[in-house]
Swiss-Prot record:
Domain of life: Bacteria
GO-annotated cellular components: ribonucleoprotein complex; ribosome
UniProt KW Ribosomal protein keyword: yes
Name the record gives this protein: Small ribosomal subunit protein uS11
Any one GO BP annotation for this protein: translation
HAMAP family (UniProt xref): Ribosomal_uS11 (MF_01310)
Source organism (scientific name): Thermosynechococcus vestitus (strain NIES-2133 / IAM M-273 / BP-1)
Function text: Located on the platform of the 30S subunit, it bridges several disparate RNA helices of the 16S rRNA. Forms part of the Shine-Dalgarno cleft in the 70S ribosome.
Subunit structure: Part of the 30S ribosomal subunit. Interacts with proteins S7 and S18. Binds to IF-3.
GO molecular function terms attached to this record: rRNA binding; structural constituent of ribosome
Keyword terms, alphabetized: Ribonucleoprotein, Ribosomal protein, RNA-binding, rRNA-binding
Gene3D superfamilies per UniProt: Ribosomal protein S11
Record family assignment: Belongs to the universal ribosomal protein uS11 family.
């Protein structure tokens, strides 16, 4: 049996980042929360799927709240205090994720909706008939 290999690469260091940007991407199927430093380097992230939800439950507001709480806790461990929030997408977890970030102890300085809106770009998919 081969001996267990020791990890010798550079470990991820804890950085002290007092302020940053929280990007919330909320779709109908999932919610992804990425917290970055002001330059855009990701410090912490979480999604409804990584928080333990599967299938249709990933699209719920409660799953978005849990994902935002997990990401906020990891960012606070790195020393984050203030964040700007960029919200993108039409999902149901948008407001809940913002409230969860605030409840976790992060001070929100700005909320901006950055959902991409086409100026009559590509043809959208046909309407669903259910």
């Amino acid at each position: 049996m081969a001996p267990s290999a020791k990890r010798s690469g550079p470990r991820k260091q804890k950085r002290n980042v007092p302020s940053g940007v929280a990007h919330i991407q909320s779709t109908f199927n999932n919610t992804i929360v990425s917290i970055t430093d002001p330059n855009g380097e990701v410090i912490a992230w979480a999604s409804a799927g990584s928080s333990g939800f599967k299938g249709a439950k990933k699209g719920t507001p409660f799953a978005a709240q849990t994902a935002a709480d997990n990401a906020a806790r990891r960012a606070i461990d790195q020393g984050m205090r203030q964040i700007e929030v960029m919200v993108s997408g039409p999902g149901s977890g948008r407001e809940t994720a913002i409230r969860a970030l605030q409840a976790a102890g992060l001070e929100i300085t700005l909320i901006r909706d950055v959902t991409p809106i086409p100026h009559n770009g590509c043809r959208p998919p046909k309407r669903r008939r259910v």
